[in-house]
Amino acid sequence: MKNSIISYPRIGANRELKFAIEKYFKAQSSKEELLETAKNLRARHWKDIQNAGIDFIPSNDFSLYDNVLDTAVLFNIVHTKYKNLNLDALDEYFAQSRGYQGENGDVTALAMKKWFNTNYHYLVPECDDASIIALTGDKIFKEYLEAKELGIESKPVLIGIFTLFKLIAFKDKKTQKLAKEKLLNAYIELFDKLNELKVTWLELDEPYLVYDLSKEDIALFEEFYQELLNHKKDLKILLQSYFGDLRDIYPKLLESKFDALGLDFIEGKQSLALVQQYGFAKDKILFAGLINGKNIYANDYAKSLKLIKELQKYTQNIILNTSCSLLHVPYSTEFESKLDPSYLKLFAFAKEKLQELKDLKEILNSSEENPLFKANQELFKNIPERLDEKVKARLKALKKEDFTRTPSFKERALIQKEFLKLPLLPTTTIGSFPQSADVRSNRLAFKQKKISAQNYTEFNQQKIKECIQIQEEIGLDVLVHGEFERNDMVEYFGENLKGFLFTQNGWVQSYGTRCVKPPIIWGDVSRTKPITLACSKFAQSLSQKIVKGMLTGPVTILNWSFPREDISLKESTEQIALAIRDEVLDLENAGIKIIQIDEAALREKLPLRKSDWHSEYLDWAIPAFNLVHSGVKAKTQIHTHMCYSEFSDILKEIDAMDADVISFEASRSNLSLLDTLKAVHFKTEVGPGVYDIHSPRVPSVEELSLTIEKILNKLPKEQIWINPDCGLKTRAYEEVIASLKNLVTATQKIRKQL
């Protein structure tokens, strides 16, 4: 029995990659220094994996920003607008990921989307008429040889041709048709080069196969691989899937020329049933994904061994594997000195998951009497308490009316127009303002008990004063307090709710250099005291204008945390919803007129197969949001915000959330959402983000005016809000002030024309 992993976290044990790239962006280090840091990280990760006894060690899973972008660059799928900047290869790469504004030109970044059902974001490759698709890159070969120099025969990992083709944004059908053959030829050339290097295994990741596949999808997949696999020669090909099962194509894969199939037995609900029904091919190896790559709880070896024994009825050719990339979990628990050992022993981050694979291999190669098995089973005895009877009783007492807000949206809209007295096209921001080094230092000093609570609060209040003053000077209509007291929109609430645990160093990559530290939902959740009330009251006291109360919604708190596995996601979300509901009512009672409840991650756990959308997710996720705000008065305006996602197919469900205003991140997708909003007669007032805050470029008044006009051409003027597409926490003040001034100027210019 051997073992494998799909891929490993890139950012480093202490986010070394993040800091190295950010230094390069600020021109504080050279290209050579950045690439040296990256090379050292790769070497360290390979050695960690090798030392853990993993047999199939991945290469080419490392990325400076995003592996989808890496794959596009490998095959020269780069839009002409980036080529025309005439930058060197590295800066052209970063121009695609961040946008570019300088002496060589002014271009926006590629669109960003959620990677399937995760909180990782990928960049959408763009292919236009001038794109010459060919194997022009060498990253996959260089990194294979790099590992080889360290004495490691690695398994290069690459996004498969079918998934890549489905993810590319083609200019039109003609461009797409021409690209198909060119891309196939490029993959064939890649196979030839890997054969020249005498590579043994290539892993092709095809997660798109876990979606609902049409006949056309299956035909396209077969067309690609019937040709491609004829060129594999001595190269062995592992077709790797994750985030679901292969029910639409599994029987065909058994008859294909792939040397191995990677199945997900964690999220793949039907993976085991498919093997039981159709068996497994004698000429193939099964890479069995049984170590959860998306959650941090320790593996129960008894369950894994039971699964392996069942699979062995159908094949003896089994490799133990992760369910997906370990990119989605933190690096290692060894940096967690503050978590009680009674909890910590029950968690496995990326490095510990390597150990779990090693243990399982050793147990399977010996017997179940192995001490490693006994030690694992001991972990699950005498675990810390998780239940709270008061929370259970409160959930049980919920009635149907607790999930419905009255009066109707139309009635509320009239009441709110009269009460709030806002102008046409009201301007606002999404919530957070830049968190400079002094803000982070103040928070750290307070956490380390180097300053008093009073000093900490006074510092934040001064920052709030400055933030309110800046917004008033710019001329925004609805203000925010800036969120200087918050480290993260989820972690901050988790820290103030009972039932959560926190890591010191549990960082996970969200996109590029953006890392998040997800809380761990351990027990039943409740609110023990007000969380945001003091900050919101203080901020509102500083201005005659409305200052929004800012909260994170229950679905996002769940989706951006590591969830419990002992109760349903529905129950866990409803517990959080009740806690946030208490906060909403406190804010309203304190005179806060607009309360924003962000559901940035609403789409994240939406099942990848449409048949499961309602029964497994939307039927409880939407009511959980309703539960949060159903108790407020008609005059209180409820806002929500949603991050990069595909919304067009769930807009009716989003409308059913019954918020009064919703802001979307829409700028990177060229506001393509507007046509769908119009088509479904979306009732909620909307703020489609008018510029991309994830890029350092400052949009001009002219650019913003054109964007606002585009929105007005699609939606009624009474329904529109003007705002950036996300919070401003990660930007510099000079960028923020310049952009917001242009936003207000553009809005005022358009108002005069209405």
Curated annotation (Swiss-Prot):
Provide the active-site residues from the annotation: 694 (proton donor)
Cofactor note as given: Binds 1 zinc ion per subunit.
Q: Which cofactor does it need?
A: Zn(2+)
Q: Give yes or no: UniProt keyword Amino-acid biosynthesis.
A: yes
Presence of keyword Transit peptide: no
Protein EC: 2.1.1.14
Top enzyme category: transferase
Q: Which residues bind 5-methyltetrahydropteroyltri-L-glutamate?
A: 15-18, 114, 514-515, 560, 604
UniProt gene name: metE
Q: Cite the binding residues for L-methionine.
A: 430-432, 483, 598
GO BP, one annotated term: methionine biosynthetic process
Task of the protein: Catalyzes the transfer of a methyl group from 5-methyltetrahydrofolate to homocysteine resulting in methionine formation.
The similarity comment for this entry is:
Belongs to the vitamin-B12 independent methionine synthase family.
Q: Output the CDD domains linked to this UniProt entry.
A: CIMS_C_terminal_like, CIMS_N_terminal_like
Residues engaged in binding Zn(2+): 641, 643, 665, 726
Q: What is this protein called?
A: 5-methyltetrahydropteroyltriglutamate--homocysteine methyltransferase
This protein's pathway: Amino-acid biosynthesis; L-methionine biosynthesis via de novo pathway; L-methionine from L-homocysteine (MetE route): step 1/1
Which reaction(s) does its UniProt entry say it catalyses?
A: 5-methyltetrahydropteroyltri-L-glutamate + L-homocysteine = tetrahydropteroyltri-L-glutamate + L-methionine
Question: InterPro entries under this entry?
Answer: Cbl-indep_Met_Synth_N, Cobalamin-indep_Met_synthase, Met_Synth_C/arc, UROD/MetE-like_sf
The entry's L-homocysteine-binding residues are 430-432, 483, 598
Could you give a GO molecular-function term held by this entry? 5-methyltetrahydropteroyltriglutamate-homocysteine S-methyltransferase activity
